[in-house]
Swiss-Prot record:
GO biological process, one term: positive regulation of growth
Keyword Amino-acid biosynthesis annotated: no
Organism: Hippoglossus hippoglossus (Atlantic halibut)
Origin: domain of life: Eukaryota
UniProt keyword annotation of Secreted present: yes
Name of this protein: Somatolactin
């Protein structure tokens, strides 16, 4: 590892708490704890906040995955992540994957796809925090990053729900995906199996977090320059 890489790692460690503290909050709660303040934000500004949240979530998930990989996953095992038994938990979700599929769906369904992804990851990230506590050498920064992503994912869910409500012009919206069956680990695995499962979770979440960011930015593009979007 060269000196430049070391310096970049040190600066990332020092600046990370300030980066998170400076991020624009998505939470629209008023003093009573309700979300009545969210509708008062324009759809354009709310979408901007949601995009910024998604960008940060993806960035931190990428850092978390790299940290976990370097600390716990030997290189030969990194190649096993895509083998049978380590499929992503969101593989069965009705999420558009190809460019042609994405181009054909409406703005509302594009946003709903983001919501499906967000909601399907809330429980797995809570589970991940629990399992990471079992690791003897898990760094405090890795634990903090995972906790931060888990908390911010809930805020992102709230923002996306309000956005869908605004786009549908509805006063109330309940959009909850039943993730039962998507994520169920009833038996405590051995340590190697636990490492591979956690590595798969982090890798798959990083991939889906990037997909959330792309979908939201595409939605923004459609609303500002519809005919020149990818």
């Amino acid at each position: 590892m060269n000196m430049m890489t070391v310096k970049q790692g040190v600066w990332a460690a020092l600046l990370w708490p300030y980066l998170l503290a400076a991020s624009i909050p998505l939470d629209c709660k008023d003093e009573q704890g309700s979300f009545s303040a969210c509708p008062s934000i324009s759809q354009e500004k709310l979408l901007d906040r949601v995009i910024q949240h998604a960008e940060l979530i993806y960035r931190v998930s990428e850092e978390s995955c790299s940290m976990f990989e370097e600390m716990f996953v030997p290189f030969p095992l990194r190649l096993q992540r895509n083998q049978a038994g380590y499929a992503c938990i969101t593989k069965a979700l009705p999420i558009p994957s190809s460019k042609s599929e994405i181009q054909q769906i409406s703005d509302t369904w594009l946003l709903h796809s983001v919501l499906l992804l967000v909601q399907s990851w809330i429980d797995p990230l809570v589970y991940l925090q629990t399992t990471l506590d079992r690791y003897d050498n898990a760094s405090e920064m890795l634990l903090n990053k995972t906790k931060w992503v888990s908390d911010k994912l809930i805020s992102l869910e709230q923002g996306v729900v309000v956005l869908i409500r605004k786009m549908l012009d509805e006063g109330m919206l309940t959009a909850t995906y039943n993730e039962q069956g998507l994520f169920q680990y009833d038996v405590l695995p051995d340590m190697l199996e636990s490492v591979m499962r956690d590595y798969t979770l982090l890798s798959c979440f990083k991939k889906d977090a990037h997909k959330m960011e792309i979908f939201l930015k595409l939605l923004k593009c459609r609303q500002t320059d519809k005919y020149n979007c990818p």
